[in-house]
Amino acid sequence: MRLYEDILIYLYTEYEMNITNKGVQYLAECIAEVYKDRIWSVHMTYLYEAIASRHDTTWKNVERLARQEVKKVSNNKLGEFILRQAIIIKQNKKKERNEK
């Protein structure tokens, strides 16, 4: 579970840095697909609300767009994408520790 917590932190960080919202939505939906439990859907709703408020729309609309993005890729690509993001997070944390 820790890996996905790291990815969620990465999501919020990327969103705050104003990286493409489509990428954030996509990664959020990847996590939501992997963990369909209630806790994750609450986190995803908060993320969708944050994106929606910035674009003057509803969180449901953001969720719908995110789901459409996910449908465009196969499950294998979905897993590869999450794995690549996890590796990036791990490398960044290692760099941070080495710099201290």
What does each model-identified segment do?
Residues 3-15, 19-25, 29-31, 36-100:
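Basic, alpha-helical nucleic-acid-binding regions used in initiation and control of genome expression
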